[in-house]
Amino acid sequence: MELYIYNKELDLLGVLDTANAVIWNRRYYAPGEFEVHTAATEIALYLIQKQYIVAKPDSVEFGIIENVIIEQTEEGEFIKATGRLGSSYLARRIVFETTIISDTVENAMRTLVYENVINPDIADRAIPNIELGTLNSFAETVHFQVSYRNLLSTLTGLAETSGIGYRLRFDPALQKFYF
């Protein structure tokens, strides 16, 4: 399987085509996890770095490398890279202000992402290259208040309560993520 590897600036660094195993666990209400096992070749050592992005060619999902372990076996050196899927980016923010929402769950999620990731009051808190995607017009409604809680935990709670999943999608051509 080919895996495309991007740096933090979303530039394509190369294609990893030597993976012995790729485990890609999706979750509907939260970010999933992934694992990549490959021989520790020169190119693999260059491509497999913490915070780099792993994308499959047939999917809009992507993973963020969080841990890299180099293992020595009788067959040689191997790399084990693990991480979470793209929505885990949202764990890097808290809901900074007291927010009261009475709207559809979908709009509530979009509002939280917009106000805390895309266009926060404190510009330094913005995460670049994340935009809102297409509105799906789900009808489920919610009435809640949240403050100083992790954004990802808040979204996961809304998803589990309402039955509406979420994810960040990656568009490598535009170098953008869409919520």
Set out the residue ranges of the language-model regions.
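Charged- and aromatic-enriched interaction segments used to assemble
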Residues: 84-179
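Hydrophobic beta-strand residues in large extracellular and virion-surface proteins
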Residues: 3-5, 36, 53-54, 65, ...
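Envelope-exposed proteins and targeting segments
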Residues: 32, 77-79, 175
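Catalytic micro-motifs at enzyme active sites that drive phosphoryl/nucleotidyl and oxygen chemistry
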Residues: 23-24, 67-72, 143-144
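Short beta-turn/strand-loop junction motif enriched in small, turn-promoting residues
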Residues: 41-43, 68-70, 164
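Short coil-to-beta transition motif at edge beta-strands of beta-rich domains
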Residues: 44-56
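Short beta-strand and beta-hairpin "edge-sheet" elements
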Residues: 53-84, 167-169
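Juxtamembrane "anchor/assembly" segments of surface/extracellular structural proteins
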Residues: 1-47, 82-90, 107-110
